């Protein structure tokens, strides 16, 4: 039994390292202007987003909608509406909630600076009970002046923000993706807090 302890320790370490593979990198500018700020505005953009194996989001939506409608009339139409409405209803609130908790910056429309979270890649993942693939997002992040959004203060990238739920009961695409946005918000908030 003693010889099994190192094995389990190694297994636990490798699992914890594997689940925290998200990378955030400051690619331009300086975050020090946020040092005296207590709030920040957030905006989200989804233009020119790649989805899974598709170079254009529109192609993915058409393919998925047709596939679901073939299985059950109207199901694809319902899914397509949720694909867009989940952004305001689920993804953005989850991001903001976890970002606030980990950054100590309150989200406010009248803040001096705005964080623009531009999702550039989405892997919706899947869960069909016997096998699954986690959701994942990549994004470009810009910190700009709220009054003059052409004035970019800093740019960063977020890679591999993972969406999954404890227990694996994330059969809904929106649920998996909302967890990816929560993961991104938490990690980005901590990243900014650590830089200040």
Map each language-model feature to its residues.
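Bacterial Sec-dependent N-terminal signal peptides
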Residues: 1-26
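A structural "domain/chain start" motif
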Residues: 21-89, 93, 190-196
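Surface-exposed short loop/turn segments
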Residues: 24-26, 102-152, 163-171
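Ser/Thr- (and often Asn-) enriched beta-sheet segments in non-cytosolic proteins
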Residues: 39-43, 114-116, 138, 157
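Generic short beta-strand segments
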Residues: 44-49, 119-124, 157-159
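Short secondary-structure boundary motifs at beta->alpha junctions and helix caps
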Residues: 70-84, 150-194
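A structural motif corresponding to the C-terminal end of an alpha-helix
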Residues: 91-106
């Amino acid at each position: 039994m003693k010889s099994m302890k190192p094995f389990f320790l190694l297994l636990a370490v490798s699992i914890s390292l594997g689940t925290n593979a998200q990378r955030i990198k400051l690619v331009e500018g300086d975050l020090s202007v946020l040092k005296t700020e207590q709030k920040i505005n957030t905006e989200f953009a989804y233009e020119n987003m790649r989805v899974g194996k598709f170079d254009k989001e529109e192609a993915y939506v058409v393919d998925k909608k047709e596939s679901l409608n073939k299985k059950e009339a109207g199901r694809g139409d319902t899914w397509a509406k949720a694909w867009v409405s989940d952004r305001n209803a689920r993804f953005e609130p989850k991001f903001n909630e976890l970002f606030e908790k980990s950054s100590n910056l309150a989200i406010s429309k009248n803040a001096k600076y705005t964080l623009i979270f531009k999702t550039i890649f989405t892997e919706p993942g899947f869960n069909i009970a016997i096998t699954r693939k986690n959701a994942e997002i990549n994004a470009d992040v810009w910190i700009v002046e709220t009054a003059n959004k052409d004035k970019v203060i800093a740019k960063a990238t977020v890679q591999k923000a993972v969406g999954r739920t404890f227990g694996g009961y994330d059969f809904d695409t929106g649920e998996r993706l909302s967890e990816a946005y929560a993961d991104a918000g938490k990690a980005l908030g901590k990243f900014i807090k650590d830089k200040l």
